[in-house]
């Protein structure tokens, strides 16, 4: 089961206290439900509402703050003149007061953006980081050596202002491929950005808005739990709406925690959590040039150091990381371009989690399954076919498929089911921007895996026909 935990951020529309249809200027129509609105947070975040964050149930509580919830972290987002039009915040900075254990996960695209190449190098030579700078507007991908030099100059400038080493400043970019960052505008905005840093909820909210592009909602979440009897916090923010396909998606993410963990262990934990979350979402089958998740651990909670991946404290922290990243990942799929609902695929009965996850990802990625969900068609044949071509062997006479709680196929045989009820289930999910749950069993193994996607609508084509990637 999952709990819907809205993150409260203001939007710049008067008298909005119920579900509405919002249409950003210049965008084609996309309908969604606004789950939570507030009316008086700082101006920098007054542009788009926040996504509902569907975090798994567990021994944690959701708290305000996003990336600033954990001890030692500050953040802010401002308008720096980087976007092609409008004055939505487009430049964000997240900092840590101390040297934080640093980890990163990146795109598998061979045309990796300049900031991706830079971050990989920085993490190779430094175990720690102090800051993450994120810009929206230009991807700085396929920009050659000039684009890489832009990254170095930006990192040098931030490092000088914060009095840290260049390699302790990590950089993420999102926007139009082939365009270098507007370096002069960015550099001119940095003094204001650094001077505006805050540990407040508002700082986290403004940063989450600043990193968005075609997103209609910002994605930010934080939880509090206990490790060894000590309270620790894990927070995060992410962006993504299109070009969402494993590995990761066109997505950027920053994760923070105040747990104390050795860097080598932290990096293994972060990659595991990414594999269970951002690598399990899909919107359109495209893999971006800029995918990046940076995760920082300040160690300021007072918890004992985690030095082994197999110890109890590591297992507890891993569960918290998984919860935060899965919540953010699902909000990205929920916000898929043109989408009317989230699709969650759960697969059981394989020999391992990895095999189950691969089948789940195959089904969630299927354009035919996505189109059937949008058409409110309970087409179990498309689900079975997508499971079958995932590349994981199973006996088809073990195949079992449910749509919600409606059994469509069992023991590899189609069943007589209430088709109007199944169609209504899909229709209700679309009308409320809810979740369509597909359950698949392929055998008697203990492996369980999940993947998330969204339906495929006419609006997806319209949005991407009108937007320069």
UniProtKB/Swiss-Prot annotation:
Pathway: Amino-acid biosynthesis; L-arginine biosynthesis; L-ornithine and N-acetyl-L-glutamate from L-glutamate and N(2)-acetyl-L-ornithine (cyclic): step 1/1; Amino-acid biosynthesis; L-arginine biosynthesis; N(2)-acetyl-L-ornithine from L-glutamate: step 1/4. Belongs to the ArgJ family. Keywords: Acyltransferase, Amino-acid biosynthesis, Arginine biosynthesis, Autocatalytic cleavage, Chloroplast, Multifunctional enzyme, Plastid, Transferase. The record marks 249-250 as: Cleavage. Pfam families: ArgJ. This protein may be expected to contain an N-terminal transit peptide but none has been predicted. It comes from the Eukaryota. InterPro entries: Arg_biosynth_ArgJ, ArgJ-like_dom_sf, ArgJ_beta_C. Gene3D superfamilies: ArgJ beta chain, C-terminal domain, L-amino peptidase D-ALA esterase/amidase. It catalyses: N(2)-acetyl-L-ornithine + L-glutamate = N-acetyl-L-glutamate + L-ornithine; L-glutamate + acetyl-CoA = N-acetyl-L-glutamate + CoA + H(+). It is found in: Plastid, Chloroplast. Its main location: plastid. Heterodimer of an alpha and a beta chain. Its EC number is 2.3.1.35, 2.3.1.1. GO terms for cellular component: chloroplast. The record marks 174-175 as: Involved in the stabilization of negative charge on the oxyanion by the formation of the oxyanion hole. GO terms for biological process: L-arginine biosynthetic process; ornithine biosynthetic process. Catalyzes two activities which are involved in the cyclic version of arginine biosynthesis: the synthesis of acetylglutamate from glutamate and acetyl-CoA, and of ornithine by transacetylation between acetylornithine and glutamate. This is Arginine biosynthesis bifunctional protein ArgJ, chloroplastic. Substrate binds at residues 213, 239, 250, 337, 464, 469. One of its GO terms (molecular function) is glutamate N-acetyltransferase activity. The keyword Chloroplast applies. The active site is at residue 250. NCBIfam families: ArgJ, PRK05388.1.
């Amino acid at each position: 089961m999952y709990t819907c935990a809205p993150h409260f951020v203001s939007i710049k529309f008067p008298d909005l206290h119920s579900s509405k249809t919002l249409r950003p200027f210049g965008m084609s129509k996309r309908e969604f439900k606004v789950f939570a609105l507030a009316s008086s947070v700082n101006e920098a975040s007054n542009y788009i509402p926040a996504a509902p964050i569907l975090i798994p149930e567990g021994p944690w509580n959701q708290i305000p703050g996003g990336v600033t919830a954990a001890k030692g972290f500050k953040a802010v987002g401002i308008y720096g003149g980087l976007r092609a039009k409008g004055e939505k915040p487009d430049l964000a900075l997240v900092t840590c007061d101390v040297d934080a254990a640093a980890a990163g996960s990146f795109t598998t695209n061979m045309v990796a953006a300049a900031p991706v190449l830079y971050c990989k190098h920085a993490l190779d030579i430094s175990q720690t980081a102090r800051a993450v700078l994120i810009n929206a507007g230009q991807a700085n991908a396929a920009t050659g050596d000039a684009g890489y030099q832009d990254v170095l100059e930006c990192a040098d400038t931030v490092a000088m202002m914060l009095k840290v080493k260049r390699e302790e400043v990590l950089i993420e970019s999102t926007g139009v491929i082939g365009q270098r960052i507007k370096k002069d505008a960015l550099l001119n905005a940095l003094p204001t950005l650094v001077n505006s840093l805050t540990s407040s909820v508002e700082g986290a909210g403004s940063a989450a808005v600043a990193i968005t592009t075609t997103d209609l909602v910002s994605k930010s979440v934080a939880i509090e739990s206990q490790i060894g009897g000590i309270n620790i916090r894990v927070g995060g923010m992410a962006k993504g709406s299109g070009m969402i396909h494993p590995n990761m998606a066109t997505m950027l993410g920053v994760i923070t925690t105040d747990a104390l963990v050795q860097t080598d262990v932290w990096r293994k934990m972060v990659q595991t959590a990414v594999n269970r979350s951002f690598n399990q979402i899909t919107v359109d089958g495209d893999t971006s040039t800029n995918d990046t998740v940076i995760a920082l651990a300040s160690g300021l909670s007072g918890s004992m150091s985690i030095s082994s991946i197999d110890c109890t404290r590591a297992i507890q922290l891993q569960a918290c990381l998984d919860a935060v990243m899965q919540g953010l990942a699902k909000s990205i799929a929920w916000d898929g371009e043109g989408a009317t609902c989230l699709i969650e695929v759960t697969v059981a009965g394989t020999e391992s989690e990895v095999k189950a996850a691969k089948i789940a990802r195959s089904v969630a990625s299927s354009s035919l399954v996505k189109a059937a969900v949008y058409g409110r068609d309970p087409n179990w044949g498309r689900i079975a076919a997508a499971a079958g071509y995932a590349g994981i062997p199973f006996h088809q006479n073990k195949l079992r498929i449910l749509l919600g709680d409606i059994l469509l196929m069992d023991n590899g045989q189609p069943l007589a089911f209430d088709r109007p009820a199944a169609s209504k289930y899909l229709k209700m999910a679309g009308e409320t921007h809810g979740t369509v749950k597909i359950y698949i069993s392929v055998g008697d193994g203990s492996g369980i895996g999940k993947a998330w996607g969204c339906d495929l609508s006419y609006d997806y084509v319209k949005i991407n026909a009108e937007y320069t990637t």
